């Protein structure tokens, strides 16, 4: 079955183990990491674990190949995971994501924006869809964001004391204002 492959670490200190197995482990010792992948999918018996220093740590994962991401297995992290794939992202009915925060986007994000905590996403003008038919479970106070040209959420999203954002457009900013509220701004010309 499909598992993430072709990792290229762009930023941060990361070791990846479990290649060619059903259980991929990504150990991150820096607060942030950026990883470009040739492909990033998880088959229904597969599991990917991101281990980070804390729940405030984050990893930007960008697919540079031509295949969509299908999450049919388990994606776990004690920290925040951002998955960007312009070819599309789908969490199937068997897929389970458990993280402190999770963002799936078909819009792109610049490395420098991520490293400076700017959650700015820009599409290519015809961004593909993000679909959730599975379960996204966010730890207390975190956020789940699905961002794409089209969003379909027929699955389950739990973010106790946290925020859920569904954004459809070609330019989206996630804004965490002082009280922890999440605002999704889509420029008016996109509406």
Functional labels for PLM-detected ranges:
Residues 1-191:
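Extracellular and secretory-pathway beta-repeat/beta-biased strand scaffolds
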